[in-house]
Curated annotation (Swiss-Prot):
<keyword id="KW-0946">Virion</keyword>
<comment type="similarity">
    <text>Belongs to the L5likevirus major capsid protein gp17 family.</text>
</comment>
<dbReference type="GO" id="GO:0019028">
    <property type="term" value="C:viral capsid"/>
</dbReference>
<keyword id="KW-0167">Capsid protein</keyword>
<dbReference type="InterPro" id="IPR054612">
    <property type="entry name" value="Phage_capsid-like_C"/>
</dbReference>
<dbReference type="Pfam" id="PF05065">
    <property type="entry name" value="Phage_capsid"/>
</dbReference>
<dbReference type="InterPro" id="IPR024455">
    <property type="entry name" value="Phage_capsid"/>
</dbReference>
<protein>
    <recommendedName>
        <fullName>Probable major capsid protein gp17</fullName>
    </recommendedName>
</protein>
Length: 318
Protein backbone atom coordinates (compact mmCIF):
# COMPACT_ATOMS: atom_id res chain seq x y z
CA UNK A 1 0.00 0.00 0.00
CA UNK A 2 1.21 3.50 -0.82
CA UNK A 3 2.36 5.63 2.08
CA UNK A 4 -0.05 8.25 3.38
CA UNK A 5 0.66 11.93 3.87
CA UNK A 6 -0.70 12.48 7.38
CA UNK A 7 2.42 11.00 8.99
CA UNK A 8 5.84 11.11 7.40
CA UNK A 9 7.81 7.94 6.75
CA UNK A 10 10.22 7.22 9.64
CA UNK A 11 7.91 9.08 12.03
CA UNK A 12 9.48 9.38 15.48
CA UNK A 13 6.45 7.87 17.25
CA UNK A 14 4.51 5.71 14.75
CA UNK A 15 5.72 2.60 12.93
CA UNK A 16 4.62 2.30 9.28
CA UNK A 17 5.33 -0.28 6.59
CA UNK A 18 7.28 2.26 4.56
CA UNK A 19 9.79 2.91 7.35
CA UNK A 20 13.43 2.42 6.43
CA UNK A 21 13.96 -0.11 9.22
CA UNK A 22 11.47 -2.56 7.63
CA UNK A 23 13.02 -2.79 4.16
CA UNK A 24 14.23 -6.20 2.98
CA UNK A 25 12.96 -8.46 5.77
CA UNK A 26 11.38 -11.92 5.45
CA UNK A 27 8.33 -13.26 7.26
CA UNK A 28 8.56 -13.16 11.07
CA UNK A 29 8.77 -16.18 13.33
CA UNK A 30 6.75 -16.79 16.46
CA UNK A 31 7.88 -14.64 19.39
CA UNK A 32 8.60 -16.01 22.86
CA UNK A 33 7.17 -15.56 26.35
CA UNK A 34 7.58 -11.87 27.10
CA UNK A 35 7.35 -11.69 30.87
CA UNK A 36 9.94 -14.45 31.18
CA UNK A 37 12.17 -12.11 29.21
CA UNK A 38 11.60 -9.36 31.78
CA UNK A 39 12.44 -11.65 34.70
CA UNK A 40 15.48 -12.92 32.87
CA UNK A 41 16.79 -9.44 32.14
CA UNK A 42 16.31 -7.92 35.60
CA UNK A 43 19.39 -8.66 37.68
CA UNK A 44 17.89 -7.47 40.97
CA UNK A 45 15.07 -9.97 40.53
CA UNK A 46 17.66 -12.74 40.16
CA UNK A 47 18.90 -12.31 43.75
CA UNK A 48 16.01 -10.66 45.63
CA UNK A 49 13.25 -12.68 47.27
CA UNK A 50 10.01 -12.84 45.30
CA UNK A 51 6.85 -12.63 47.41
CA UNK A 52 3.16 -13.05 46.52
CA UNK A 53 1.58 -9.69 45.80
CA UNK A 54 -2.07 -8.66 46.16
CA UNK A 55 -3.70 -5.64 44.58
CA UNK A 56 -3.41 -3.69 47.84
CA UNK A 57 0.13 -4.83 48.63
CA UNK A 58 1.51 -7.05 51.35
CA UNK A 59 2.24 -6.64 55.06
CA UNK A 60 5.49 -8.47 55.78
CA UNK A 61 6.23 -9.49 59.42
CA UNK A 62 9.84 -9.09 60.48
CA UNK A 63 11.58 -10.16 63.71
CA UNK A 64 13.89 -7.48 65.09
CA UNK A 65 14.65 -8.93 68.52
CA UNK A 66 16.43 -12.10 69.63
CA UNK A 67 14.80 -14.72 71.82
CA UNK A 68 17.08 -15.52 74.77
CA UNK A 69 17.63 -18.51 77.04
CA UNK A 70 19.82 -19.05 80.11
CA UNK A 71 21.41 -21.96 81.92
CA UNK A 72 19.83 -22.53 85.34
CA UNK A 73 20.34 -24.74 88.32
CA UNK A 74 17.90 -27.08 90.00
CA UNK A 75 14.96 -25.20 91.44
CA UNK A 76 16.08 -21.85 89.95
CA UNK A 77 13.53 -19.47 88.51
CA UNK A 78 13.22 -19.85 84.77
CA UNK A 79 13.95 -16.73 82.70
CA UNK A 80 11.26 -15.13 80.56
CA UNK A 81 11.80 -14.04 76.97
CA UNK A 82 9.59 -12.28 74.48
CA UNK A 83 11.48 -11.11 71.41
CA UNK A 84 10.19 -8.32 69.23
CA UNK A 85 8.63 -8.07 65.83
CA UNK A 86 7.64 -5.35 63.44
CA UNK A 87 6.17 -5.29 59.95
CA UNK A 88 6.85 -3.72 56.59
CA UNK A 89 4.07 -2.82 54.18
CA UNK A 90 4.93 -2.85 50.50
CA UNK A 91 2.57 -1.64 47.80
CA UNK A 92 2.60 -2.27 44.05
CA UNK A 93 3.21 0.55 41.59
CA UNK A 94 2.28 0.64 37.93
CA UNK A 95 4.66 1.09 35.01
CA UNK A 96 3.25 1.55 31.51
CA UNK A 97 3.91 2.57 27.93
CA UNK A 98 2.08 2.71 24.59
CA UNK A 99 3.47 1.99 21.15
CA UNK A 100 1.65 2.89 17.94
CA UNK A 101 1.75 1.35 14.47
CA UNK A 102 -0.31 1.64 11.32
CA UNK A 103 -2.86 -1.09 10.64
CA UNK A 104 -0.80 -2.08 7.61
CA UNK A 105 2.26 -2.56 9.79
CA UNK A 106 0.26 -4.74 12.17
CA UNK A 107 -0.93 -6.95 9.30
CA UNK A 108 2.44 -7.23 7.55
CA UNK A 109 4.50 -7.30 10.77
CA UNK A 110 7.78 -6.70 8.91
CA UNK A 111 10.91 -7.98 10.67
CA UNK A 112 8.66 -9.32 13.45
CA UNK A 113 8.28 -5.71 14.57
CA UNK A 114 5.40 -6.37 16.95
CA UNK A 115 7.06 -9.37 18.59
CA UNK A 116 10.32 -7.47 18.94
CA UNK A 117 8.56 -4.43 20.39
CA UNK A 118 6.86 -6.57 23.02
CA UNK A 119 10.21 -8.03 24.03
CA UNK A 120 11.85 -4.60 24.04
CA UNK A 121 9.06 -3.19 26.22
CA UNK A 122 9.51 -6.06 28.67
CA UNK A 123 13.23 -5.29 28.76
CA UNK A 124 12.53 -1.58 29.29
CA UNK A 125 10.30 -2.44 32.25
CA UNK A 126 13.04 -4.61 33.74
CA UNK A 127 15.64 -1.85 33.28
CA UNK A 128 13.34 0.67 34.97
CA UNK A 129 12.78 -1.77 37.84
CA UNK A 130 16.52 -2.30 38.34
CA UNK A 131 17.26 1.42 38.18
CA UNK A 132 14.65 2.09 40.86
CA UNK A 133 15.76 -0.82 43.05
CA UNK A 134 19.48 -0.05 42.87
CA UNK A 135 19.71 3.73 42.56
CA UNK A 136 16.21 5.10 43.16
CA UNK A 137 16.05 6.34 39.56
CA UNK A 138 12.55 7.78 38.90
CA UNK A 139 11.43 5.41 41.64
CA UNK A 140 7.98 5.15 43.22
CA UNK A 141 9.50 2.93 45.93
CA UNK A 142 10.64 4.65 49.16
CA UNK A 143 13.71 2.42 49.64
CA UNK A 144 16.55 1.27 47.41
CA UNK A 145 19.99 -0.34 47.71
CA UNK A 146 21.96 2.82 46.97
CA UNK A 147 20.74 4.45 50.19
CA UNK A 148 23.56 2.67 52.00
CA UNK A 149 26.26 4.84 53.56
CA UNK A 150 28.88 2.11 53.16
CA UNK A 151 31.23 2.30 50.17
CA UNK A 152 34.55 0.83 49.08
CA UNK A 153 36.56 1.33 45.90
CA UNK A 154 37.61 -1.68 43.85
CA UNK A 155 39.73 0.54 41.60
CA UNK A 156 41.86 2.09 44.36
CA UNK A 157 44.50 -0.65 44.61
CA UNK A 158 47.62 1.39 45.25
CA UNK A 159 50.63 -0.22 46.91
CA UNK A 160 50.08 -3.73 48.23
CA UNK A 161 46.28 -3.37 48.32
CA UNK A 162 44.52 -5.67 45.85
CA UNK A 163 40.97 -5.98 44.57
CA UNK A 164 40.65 -9.03 46.81
CA UNK A 165 41.66 -6.90 49.81
CA UNK A 166 39.12 -4.23 48.95
CA UNK A 167 36.20 -6.62 48.43
CA UNK A 168 36.83 -9.69 50.59
CA UNK A 169 38.57 -7.89 53.46
CA UNK A 170 37.67 -4.20 53.62
CA UNK A 171 34.20 -4.45 52.09
CA UNK A 172 33.32 -7.56 54.07
CA UNK A 173 34.60 -5.90 57.25
CA UNK A 174 32.18 -3.01 56.76
CA UNK A 175 29.37 -5.54 56.73
CA UNK A 176 30.32 -8.01 59.46
CA UNK A 177 31.42 -5.27 61.87
CA UNK A 178 27.88 -3.92 61.56
CA UNK A 179 26.30 -7.34 62.05
CA UNK A 180 25.50 -7.78 58.35
CA UNK A 181 26.16 -10.57 55.85
CA UNK A 182 27.62 -10.87 52.36
CA UNK A 183 25.47 -13.20 50.26
CA UNK A 184 25.64 -11.88 46.68
CA UNK A 185 27.38 -9.32 44.46
CA UNK A 186 26.21 -7.19 41.54
CA UNK A 187 28.80 -5.60 39.26
CA UNK A 188 28.68 -3.59 36.06
CA UNK A 189 30.42 -4.81 32.93
CA UNK A 190 32.86 -1.90 33.15
CA UNK A 191 34.49 -3.65 36.12
CA UNK A 192 35.62 -6.54 33.92
CA UNK A 193 39.09 -5.06 33.24
CA UNK A 194 39.53 -4.73 37.02
CA UNK A 195 38.38 -8.29 37.63
CA UNK A 196 40.42 -9.83 34.82
CA UNK A 197 43.70 -9.24 36.63
CA UNK A 198 42.36 -9.78 40.14
CA UNK A 199 43.44 -12.88 42.09
CA UNK A 200 42.48 -14.34 45.43
CA UNK A 201 45.00 -15.28 48.13
CA UNK A 202 45.71 -18.58 46.39
CA UNK A 203 46.48 -16.95 43.06
CA UNK A 204 43.21 -18.01 41.45
CA UNK A 205 40.95 -15.61 39.50
CA UNK A 206 38.83 -13.58 41.90
CA UNK A 207 35.79 -13.84 39.63
CA UNK A 208 35.09 -17.44 38.67
CA UNK A 209 32.58 -17.61 35.84
CA UNK A 210 29.84 -20.22 35.96
CA UNK A 211 30.73 -23.38 34.05
CA UNK A 212 27.27 -23.63 32.58
CA UNK A 213 25.39 -20.58 31.40
CA UNK A 214 23.02 -19.53 28.67
CA UNK A 215 24.79 -18.40 25.53
CA UNK A 216 22.20 -15.65 24.97
CA UNK A 217 21.97 -14.57 28.61
CA UNK A 218 21.88 -10.78 29.05
CA UNK A 219 24.28 -11.05 32.00
CA UNK A 220 27.29 -13.09 33.12
CA UNK A 221 27.04 -15.11 36.30
CA UNK A 222 29.79 -16.50 38.48
CA UNK A 223 31.20 -16.28 41.99
CA UNK A 224 33.48 -13.99 43.99
CA UNK A 225 34.78 -15.63 47.17
CA UNK A 226 32.06 -18.29 46.80
CA UNK A 227 29.29 -15.65 46.66
CA UNK A 228 26.99 -15.69 43.61
CA UNK A 229 27.87 -12.74 41.39
CA UNK A 230 26.29 -11.15 38.32
CA UNK A 231 27.97 -8.86 35.80
CA UNK A 232 25.57 -6.79 33.71
CA UNK A 233 25.56 -3.64 31.63
CA UNK A 234 23.20 -1.46 33.64
CA UNK A 235 24.54 -1.43 37.20
CA UNK A 236 26.73 1.66 36.96
CA UNK A 237 25.46 5.01 38.25
CA UNK A 238 28.01 7.79 38.62
CA UNK A 239 31.01 6.31 40.44
CA UNK A 240 29.02 3.35 41.77
CA UNK A 241 29.82 0.23 39.74
CA UNK A 242 28.27 -2.46 41.92
CA UNK A 243 26.92 -3.64 45.26
CA UNK A 244 27.85 -6.41 47.68
CA UNK A 245 25.75 -7.38 50.67
CA UNK A 246 22.83 -9.32 52.03
CA UNK A 247 20.31 -9.66 49.22
CA UNK A 248 17.88 -11.48 51.51
CA UNK A 249 17.02 -7.94 52.67
CA UNK A 250 15.37 -7.32 49.29
CA UNK A 251 11.87 -8.43 48.40
CA UNK A 252 9.86 -7.84 45.25
CA UNK A 253 6.52 -8.88 43.86
CA UNK A 254 4.23 -8.43 40.91
CA UNK A 255 0.52 -8.52 40.17
CA UNK A 256 0.06 -10.86 37.24
CA UNK A 257 2.39 -10.43 34.30
CA UNK A 258 2.69 -7.86 31.57
CA UNK A 259 -0.76 -6.71 30.45
CA UNK A 260 -1.19 -6.00 26.72
CA UNK A 261 -4.25 -4.09 25.43
CA UNK A 262 -4.78 -3.35 21.74
CA UNK A 263 -7.17 -0.75 20.31
CA UNK A 264 -7.82 1.23 17.14
CA UNK A 265 -10.63 3.33 18.65
CA UNK A 266 -8.84 5.63 21.09
CA UNK A 267 -7.45 9.14 20.77
CA UNK A 268 -3.79 9.52 21.69
CA UNK A 269 -1.76 12.54 22.67
CA UNK A 270 1.41 12.40 20.57
CA UNK A 271 2.58 15.67 22.09
CA UNK A 272 3.09 16.60 25.72
CA UNK A 273 0.81 17.60 28.58
CA UNK A 274 1.75 21.24 28.01
CA UNK A 275 1.56 21.07 24.19
CA UNK A 276 -0.89 18.30 23.28
CA UNK A 277 -1.22 16.80 19.80
CA UNK A 278 -4.30 14.61 19.81
CA UNK A 279 -4.63 12.01 17.05
CA UNK A 280 -7.60 9.73 16.35
CA UNK A 281 -6.41 6.16 15.82
CA UNK A 282 -9.58 5.25 13.91
CA UNK A 283 -9.37 8.24 11.58
CA UNK A 284 -5.75 7.55 10.67
CA UNK A 285 -6.01 3.74 10.58
CA UNK A 286 -3.59 3.32 13.47
CA UNK A 287 -3.34 0.66 16.15
CA UNK A 288 -2.07 1.31 19.69
CA UNK A 289 -0.72 -1.31 22.06
CA UNK A 290 -0.79 -0.40 25.75
CA UNK A 291 1.55 -2.34 28.02
CA UNK A 292 1.26 -2.23 31.81
CA UNK A 293 2.74 -4.03 34.77
CA UNK A 294 2.57 -3.62 38.53
CA UNK A 295 5.66 -4.20 40.65
CA UNK A 296 6.48 -3.86 44.33
CA UNK A 297 9.96 -3.59 45.83
CA UNK A 298 11.36 -3.06 49.31
CA UNK A 299 14.89 -2.81 50.66
CA UNK A 300 14.53 -3.70 54.33
CA UNK A 301 18.03 -2.56 55.34
CA UNK A 302 20.17 -0.46 53.01
CA UNK A 303 23.07 -0.68 55.47
CA UNK A 304 23.26 -4.41 54.69
CA UNK A 305 24.96 -3.37 51.43
CA UNK A 306 28.27 -1.85 50.41
CA UNK A 307 28.43 0.31 47.29
CA UNK A 308 31.41 -0.67 45.14
CA UNK A 309 32.95 2.32 43.36
CA UNK A 310 35.66 3.06 40.83
CA UNK A 311 37.01 6.08 42.71
CA UNK A 312 40.80 6.18 43.07
CA UNK A 313 42.91 8.19 45.50
CA UNK A 314 42.99 11.81 44.41
CA UNK A 315 39.34 11.94 43.39
CA UNK A 316 39.55 10.34 39.94
CA UNK A 317 37.91 7.27 38.50
CA UNK A 318 39.49 3.97 37.61
Amino acid sequence: MAAGTAFAVDHAQIAQTGDTMFKGYLEPEQAKDYFAEAEKTSIVQQFAQKVPMGTTGQKIPHWVGDVSAQWIGEGDMKPITKGNMTSQTIAPHKIATIFVASAETVRANPANYLGTMRTKVATAFAMAFDGAAMHGTDSPFPTYIGQTTKAISIADTTGATTVYDQVAVNGLSLLVNDGKKWTHTLLDDITEPILNGAKDQNGRPLFIESTYGEAASPFRSGRIVARPTILSDHVVEGTTVGFMGDFSQLIWGQIGGLSFDVTDQATLNLGTVESPNFVSLWQHNLVAVRVEAEYAFHCNDAEAFVALTNVVSGGGEG
